[in-house]
Amino acid sequence: MIRNLLLTASVLALTGAVSMPAQAQSAAGAYLAGRHAAVRSDFAESAKYYGEALALDPKNPEFLESTVLALLSLGNIERALPLARVMAASDQPGQIAYLVTTAGMAQEEDYAGLIAQSADEGGIGPWVDGLVKAWAQVGAGDMTAALAQFDALSTEAGMQGFVMYHKALALASVGDYEGAEAIFAANQSGSAGQTRRGVIARVEILGQLGRNEQALALLTDSFGANSDPELDDLVAALQGDGQVAFTQIPDAKAGIAEVFFTFAAVLRNESAGDYYVLLYSRIARYLRPDHIDDLLLTADLLENIGQYELAIQELQDVPADNPAYHAAELGRAAALRRSNKPEQAIEVLQQLTRSHGTLPSVHSALGDALRAQDDFKAAIKSYDKAIELTPDSNPQRWVLYYARGIAEERLGNGEASERDFRTALEINPDQPQVLNYLGYSLVEQGRNLDEALNMIERAVAASPDSGYIVDSLGWVLYRLGRYEEAVDQMERAVELVAVDPVLNDHLGDVYWSVGRQREAEFQWRRALSFVDPEDQDSEADPERMRRKLEVGLDAVLAEEGAEPLSKASAEK
């Protein structure tokens, strides 16, 4: 539909401009400006221009829908709502109108209206409509009808676990904790009950039932040594004398918000477009502003589509005393880094080390930010602290050793780097990134080439579609003098990552080694065309590529004092 709107507007603007009245031309121009802004995911600009077009042509259904969609994407549902109600009253209201009017009725706690709307044709979709109706029946006080609605939905294939999860939450929201726990205990909630929110909901339910030891065991089983302020607060409450409150879904409006959050998470896991997922997360955020998990999801979606300032605005809404404050600040730092504001990101993370200095994730994030700025010494200190704070039982410790190893390697500390990589492999023996990095490093040093080959072959087996790892395999075969075998691997690597200068350069070297000089020169020229002079971290060496084009690889190796190709594998 959106594409059709764009094509229609293009026809209006390009083929009908001569005969259209001036006002119609202005409306079409504003609409096209809105479309251009929407393509950039600039929701504020698109809402502005669509609004101008709509003001000039209030009855145009395309202008109306586009304006509502832009306002919903921007999170301005209050402004979108009256326009969506106009759409809903038309002959063809569409899904966007149902999304916004449903949000409006839920916000107003018009449960009778929601129940009546669900009986109409159309709607958002059968699962969302069905769950919203069930929660509306909870809000209307008709628990019998609500439970019957949940049960009816649960007979349909595909989403039974999510339906039963919501049924458990609905029971808990009205105080039937025994009924809610029975659903969780029977594992009827499926994967939804195993998410972080699902586990915390069940822990709170067990706390309401006075089964604190079971709740504590569930936390340990689910999160192990991975703790954070929210989990720490929950543990403290369970170990104390008071009763743990059920906060996950306190009422029916929160339940409807959870429907939209649940489906946003499902859609994202199914690789739906971030723009589409954002519509659902925006509604959840509108209905429940304190839904921190949805806030973090919304910010992440905005960051992924390049709307860094909007993402930062969302994250700044989390107060400093909220248990999720550190997560929001980590997200804000990530958005600042992606918006080319690394110094500000580092400032945020440094402040976080002062306010939340006991969290390993804070120090590791600072290490990553410093490493990206080539401040390897400071990065190593941050990784040191993160490793010190991370329990030995945490299986994710390998990431810290891997990151520190990279920083050590960039400083030229070969022994320390290799030691960290090998420690990472002791923790996670088949981790392809570590196997590849260490194997490739050994190849570049001309050491332990047989061991390097074994490591990289294992890495390729684990990640066969990673062009960089396949390149490493081709390169070690080349260094071992197994040139014909290297060709197949290098060609495969370039198929996977066609525009990388290093991979194309490597393929050129391999072609030269088997006598395919013209193809080698072609690859070196391709490699040169892909070199980014602004990329200081790239291994690409354009001067060496040019020299190879001038005199050939054999002459370059001789100039460098390297072994000729026929003897390249002599030292292992």
Predicted features and spans:
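Generic helix N-cap/helix-start motif at coil->alpha-helix transitions
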Residues: A24-A30, D57-L64, S90-L99, E121-V132, ...
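Terminal, low-structured helical/coil segments at or just beyond the last alpha-helical repeat
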Residues: L234-A237, D241-V266, R518-K572
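Residue-level recognition of tetratricopeptide repeat
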Residues: R35, L69, A103, W135, ...
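Residue-level detector of the short coil/turn that links helix A to helix B
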Residues: S41, G75, E109, G141, ...
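Conserved structural position within tetratricopeptide repeats
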Residues: E52-A55, V86-A89, D120-G123, S154-T155, ...
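Position-specific recognition of the canonical hydrophobic site in helix A of tetratricopeptide repeat
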Residues: A38, L72, A106, V138, ...
